[in-house]
Regions:
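A short acidic, Gly/Pro-enriched loop at the edge of an enzyme's catalytic core
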Residues: 4-13
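Short, hinge-like loop/turn segments at secondary-structure boundaries
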Residues: 13, 62-66, 167-169
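Residues lining the SAM
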Residues: 15-19, 48
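A short glycine-rich, Lys/Arg-flanked "PGG" loop and its adjoining helix->strand segment in the class I
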Residues: 28-44
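A short hydrophobic/small-residue beta-strand
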Residues: 45-46, 148
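C-terminal lobe and adjacent flexible extensions of AdoMet/dcAdoMet transferase-like proteins
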Residues: 123-173
Length: 173
């Protein structure tokens, strides 16, 4: 998202659950700048981030004893998702590193496609993500040029609370 160039401008851009996956904070800021440049005047950028502190599973990964146990083992394959062609798809995820000082994590993803009991495709890759809190993202949006910025919790009309799992930002160009 940090390097896209599109031939026109948009009234709305929505980043759903993927902000912070550009690989670095610099690239994340560049993503916001690109979004700003691809919006019409008075256009809106909407994006959501997880409130890490609402999940004990996520928050505990910041503790030394949990970081020292990384990388996490691959989870069991679990149930397949069956596609319309009958093929079965498996996805596995694991955390291999969390850096509380840099507010970042590294996750590995393993995907498999099976057809008639045979593995026909597989891929494995690594994602580096950044963890953001409300005020840091507000500042980044201002630096990117946005003027009116509101924050809501869990896709409601009200302001966020400390118990809501998602923060939803609306930033106007």
């Amino acid at each position: 998202m940090h390097a896209f160039e599109l031939p026109r401008k948009y009234k709305t851009i929505y980043i759903c659950g993927s902000f912070g996956l550009a690989g670095s904070r610099e690239k994340d800021l560049e993503t916001l700048r690109h979004c700003y440049s691809h919006l019409e005047d008075d256009g809106a950028l909407l994006l959501n981030i997880e409130a890490e502190y609402t999940s004990s599973e996520s928050w505990n990964l910041w503790l030394p004893e949990h970081r020292q146990a990384m990388p996490q083992p691959w989870p069991e394959k679990g149930d397949a998702r069956v596609a319309s062609d009958g093929s079965e798809h498996f996805a596995q995820f694991r955390i291999v590193d969390v850096d509380p000082l840099e507010q970042s994590y590294t996750r590995q993803v393993r995907l498999e496609k099976w057809s008639n009991g045979e593995l026909v495709a597989s891929e494995e890759y690594t994602l580096r993500g950044s963890i953001y809190f409300k005020h840091e993202l507000l500042l980044m949006l201002k630096v990117a040029g946005f003027r009116e910025i509101t924050v809501h919790g869990d896709y409601t009309d009200g302001p966020p609370t400390t118990d809501q799992e998602e923060l939803v930002f609306t930033a106007i160009r």
